Design a protein with these regions (language model features):
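N-terminal export/assembly segments and adjacent metallocofactor-ligating motifs
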Residues: 2-299, 325, 466, 471, ...
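Catalytic or ion-translocation cores adjacent to nucleophile or general acid/base/metal-coordination motifs
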Residues: 520-545, 755-756
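Active-site phosphate/pyrophosphate-binding segments
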Residues: 323-444
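Long, well-ordered, tryptophan-enriched scaffold segments
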Residues: 263-367
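Long, contiguous, secondary-structure-rich segments that constitute the structural scaffold
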Residues: 556-608, 700-702, 706-717, 721-808
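A glycine-rich phosphate-binding loop feature that marks nucleotide/adenosyl-phosphate handling sites
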Residues: 160-161, 307-310, 364, 407-418, ...
């Protein structure tokens, strides 16, 4: 057993024997196991310590409450929500192993403590300590110079999700305090989309006008649950998440659950009735094969299609559509491609047997209501926009939209208590790019156009990005694609001239900073955080500083206020409005109380720590009002109906500049894509590769916590058939490589992944000698992913990759 396998009195073997999650959570919080070794005296001593409410506000989205025990200005141990009856519908918001390990993040020896400036090349991680005055003066001077020389469009706030839950501390670029500062100083280049949901958020509004789904709790009214790539047991596994609600809802309904995923996930893991492994990027082909059976066996809901939909057949096809341009013609082989989408056709593409496709179609066609949903993995493909719209066709064809127990085909919705956010003000700059295209905007911004690159607000960019704010995010490098190419672009200082990083640790992104500033964590400052991704129970968490400020770490509001001072008294006044961070919170909460008098007072919430409220409507049913009365409650589509055929997409397909292997279609069709299952490149790189969300991290956050790394090792999943061909045994060190880069890590040989497919947890910290061989020993999947965006959303296709794996 290696030294990394035994920490804080708990071995990996013991963890596994103890069902891992619960035991590890306690260990990460500072306990030693077994529990009997804890003396009663120690328990009494801990109970008498000061307890401060905090929260884990990272981008799993669930935002769990933490009770941090503090002694002598140090966090000694961590527990979680202990309020209420802990019954279904009013459950305790219990943090997972990540949140419970926050003490290790707070006290980590690698915390950033002082402002620093770069003294080596970008990416080398060489810095020297400077004063706050020098750091702030440098930032303000560079920002002024950039705006004077290039204009505000040359300033960019990098995509970030390190603090999605916070209000004053929120890092989301469109809603952060950084955005407010820039809007007080003439604005900055906008961005649209996200690394999580670019394709589905773009595509579903063409069908429904929005991207809503029924709440998970509504599964208690379902007869069948079909999940395409939806894995809440790992992506939303905490007490604030929906895994518990999924289990409870199925207990009530006894609904059969079918999981469709290339990987046998923990959401399946014995909970499912059936797992159907599928080749990545082929979900739309499976849907088409199912649709063929539904149509030919008269299992479609024709009255629903006639009344609520546009483009299913010739009766509702828009006048501007070509003859036989409807969905039914596409499925039956009467459209342009003259290919019937039979189960045999679908089986060759998906790898799912013909008889199972037919059986699944009949199950979907006869079980009503059926809850058909998709996670965000299937859409994070190069053809993800088509996939998202295609999966939505199953509830549309069967009339499961807008009813209790049904769904729209989207991911589940949650009930939240709306909070009053720090206003970011209007951005004078109206130009925007896809959040995934920022490296292009640095490298060749003025060549980017609306019809080729998705520039919005004008026909083309006028200037490249010259100044980057990177606050509480690792998307500058680690979470962006093709790290080696990104490194090449960022290291050229003649392109982007200033990078400001505000962080807690020396992340992969922080190594590329010109000025690096030490931020406080959310638990070290006052803030109010709402829930998200938490079923039908909303809550608010009041965070108080768990300790005093240490070293020279500062909160984001203070940092930006000081920059604002240096930009001019008018900017400072407009940014702060004369308020401190605490005064802003009180001001914003007063607005919340005026709109929602049922909320506790500010002081009451501060004392409570957490306030919970169940959805007064019980469950959220997406598009129920439309289903009940489509005339009075039209959808936000051009027709006001569900648009199976989208004239808007037809126009985009006709006018945009696309590559030969890119498809934008008015119908939710299946299309092959670059680096897909049928790509000619498979002769060199035969394995499909995708990343998945891993228990030990939320993206890259918590990726440096040793106890989590020991319990949840970074490995590449490979099927025994593929491993045997390569002479690979479980635990062997292997090289995973393609023409973009190489990663070295252990192999996990398991039948839990489809032959021909490999996978690794995304978010591992990139560790490579970037002035040498560039081989990544940290296991970061983005060493291997592509910078080429998807056709419509111009979004992140990080699950579309081909690789080879060899034993070292």
């Amino acid at each position: 057993m290696s030294k990394n396998e035994r920490m804080v009195g708990i071995s990996r073997r013991t963890l596994v024997k103890s069902t891992a999650i619960g035991s590890l959570a306690l260990a990460a919080g500072g306990f030693s196991l077994p529990f009997t070794l804890r003396s009663a005296a120690a328990a009494v001593q801990q109970a008498s310590e000061k307890v401060v409410w905090g929260a884990c506000s990272v981008n799993c989205g669930s935002r769990c409450a933490l009770r941090l025990h503090v002694k002598d200005n140090e966090v000694t141990w961590v527990e979680t929500d202990n309020t209420g009856s802990d019954k279904y519908g009013n459950h305790q918001v219990r943090a997972c192993l990540r949140g419970r390990s926050i003490r290790r993040r707070i006290n980590h020896p690698d915390r950033l403590n002082y402002p620093m400036k770069r003294v080596g090349k970008r990416g080398e991680g060489k810095f020297e300590r400077i004063s706050w005055d020098e750091a702030l003066d440098t930032i303000a001077s560079s920002l002024k110079k950039t705006v004077e020389q290039y204009g505000n469009e040359a300033v960019y706030i990098q995509y970030s999700s390190g603090i999605v839950g916070g209000n004053m501390t929120r890092s989301s670029p469109s809603a952060s305090a950084v955005k407010r500062l820039m809007n007080c100083y003439g604005g900055s280049l906008n961005q649209y989309g996200s690394y999580s949901t670019a394709q589905i958020s773009c595509a579903m509004p063409y069908t429904y006008g929005s991207n809503d789904g029924n709440s998970t709790t509504d599964i208690e009214n379902s007869k069948l649950v079909v999940m395409f790539g939806n894995n809440p047991a790992e992506t939303r596994m905490s007490g604030g998440g929906i895994t518990y609600l999924l289990e409870k809802a199925r207990e009530k309904s006894n609904a059969k659950m079918i999981v469709i995923d290339p990987r046998y996930t923990d959401t399946a893991a014995g909970r499912e009735d059936e797992w159907l492994p599928i080749r990545p990027g082929t979900d739309a082909a499976l849907v088409a094969g199912i649709a063929w059976v539904l149509i030919n066996e008269n299992l479609v809901d024709q009255p629903f299609l006639d009344k609520y939909c546009v483009g299913y057949d010739e009766k509702t096809l828009p006048a501007d559509a070509p003859k036989n341009g409807h969905y039914k013609a596409y499925i039956l082989g009467e459209g342009d491609d003259k290919t019937a989408k039979t189960p045999q056709w679908a089986s060759q593409i998906t790898g799912i047997p013909v008889d199972r496709i037919i059986k699944l179609a009949r199950e979907i066609g006869t079980a009503k209501p059926a809850y058909i949903c998709q996670g965000w993995g299937p859409q994070r493909q190069a053809n993800g926009e088509l996939t998202a719209r295609a999966i939505a066709m199953l509830p549309i064809l069967t009339g499961n939209v807008g009813i209790s127990g049904g769904n729209s085909g989207a991911r589940e919705s949650t009930y939240t208590i709306t909070i009053e956010r720090l206003p970011v003000l209007d951005n004078p700059v109206k130009t925007s790019i896809s959040c995934f295209s920022w490296t292009d905007a640095i490298d060749h911004g003025p060549q980017m156009t609306a019809i080729r690159d998705g520039v919005r607000g004008k026909d083309k960019l006028d200037v490249p990005i010259k100044f980057i704010w990177n606050y509480a995010g690792n998307t500058l490098v680690n979470q962006h694609s093709d790290i080696n190419k990104t490194h090449e672009i960022l290291q050229d200082e003649s392109k982007c001239e200033m990078i400001v990083v505000i962080e807690n640790f020396m992340t992969s992104s922080a190594k590329y900073a010109d000025i690096l500033l030490p931020d406080l964590m959310t638990v070290e400052q006052e803030d109010i955080i709402p829930n998200d991704y938490a079923g039908n129970m909303g809550y608010l968490i009041f965070l108080q500083p768990v300790t005093s400020e240490k070293f020279e770490r500062k909160p984001i509001y203070w940092i930006l206020s000081e920059v604002a001072k240096r930009l001019g008294p008018d900017v400072y006044q407009k940014f702060t409005e004369g308020r401190t961070q605490e005064q802003w919170l009180q001001h914003l909460y007063a607005k919340m109380l005026a709109k929602d008098p049922a909320l506790p007072s500010y002081d009451e919430l501060k004392k409570m720590g957490i306030y919970k409220r169940k959805d007064p409507n019980g469950h959220f049913v997406a598009y129920k009002a439309f289903r009940d009365d489509p005339e009075a409650n039209p959808l936000k589509t051009p027709s006001g109906k569900i648009e199976i055929y989208s004239s808007k997409l037809a126009e985009i397909a006709r006018t945009w500049e696309l590559e030969k292997d890119e498809v934008i279609s008015p119908l939710p069709v299946y299309a092959s894509t670059f680096e897909g299952w049928d790509s000619p490149e498979r002769s060199t790189f035969p394995l499909q590769l995708f990343g998945f969300h891993y228990k030990s991290r939320t993206h890259s956050t918590y990726g440096n916590i040793d106890v989590l790394k020991a319990a949840c090792r970074q490995e590449v999943w490979i099927n025994p058939i593929d491993a045997q061909k390569r002479g690979i045994a479980n635990g062997d060190m292997v090289r995973v490589f393609n023409h973009r880069g190489e990663v070295r890590l252990p192999a996990k040989v398991t039948p839990r992944i489809l032959p021909g497919v490999s996978a690794m947890g995304q978010g591992a910290w990139h560790e490579a000698n970037m002035s040498g061989d560039k081989i990544d020993h940290g296991g970061c999947v983005n060493t291997l992913t592509t910078l080429r965006p998807s056709p419509l959303a111009k979004g992140n296709p990080q699950h579309t990759n081909l690789v080879e794996i060899e034993k070292i």
